[in-house]
Amino acid sequence: MREILIEPVEVLIIDLENTCMHEAERPENYHGQIIEIGAAWVTPTGEVLEKFSTLVQAENPVTEFCTELLGITQADVDGGLLFADAMQALAEFATRHSSRTWGSWGAADLKSLNHDCAHHGLESPLAGWEHRNIKKEWAKARKIKQVGMKKALEIARIDLEGPHHRALSDVLNIVKLYAAGWPALHNLPKADPDFMQGRPEIIELTGGAR
């Protein structure tokens, strides 16, 4: 029996960037803390309704390795919102639409959000929401193994836009994969160039927080 997916009218797509260390220097049980949040409310066809982005202060220092990878400095993070304020801002953005479904590229963002909220004694602003693992679902649609976002864009013949490993840029690239993924579940060839070239354009509207 073919699986039938019913898409919500809108989905909140989120990407988180975390503090990080080189593997050789990383202590045991190290947990990268959230330092940047990117989010967008989108339709299944890839229309971006609203966008949100903020830097977040963290207890962990921003290492040189982290700055090289993310392009985020300690000064950037020091100028960000306190974690509780960032969660409040995300909660307010999340309630702008009636859907209670959010997605990310993989499960790491879900785990990171829950971990950091628990660390600060806060309830996740997305507690009780359905989480969509877009990385897993996108790979399933094409009957391939799960890959990173950048590799998925290459497979889908979609150009990477904006700096990789910046939260909002990654969100907008995930939106393209999200919009391109679902027709493949309905018997479209997994490498149909006409479909990929005819993907919906991203419509950027104002209205999200900074």
Language-model-derived ranges and their functions:
Residues 1-16, 21:
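N-terminal accessory regions of nucleic-acid-interacting proteins
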Residues 68-88:
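Metal-dependent phosphoesterase signature
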Residues 21-23, 139:
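Conserved protein kinase catalytic core
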Residues 2-4, 9, 30-37, 41-70, ...:
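Metal-dependent phosphoesterase core characteristic of DEDDh/y 3'-5' exonuclease domains
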Residues 24-28:
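Short, P/G- and charge-enriched loop/turn segments at secondary-structure junctions
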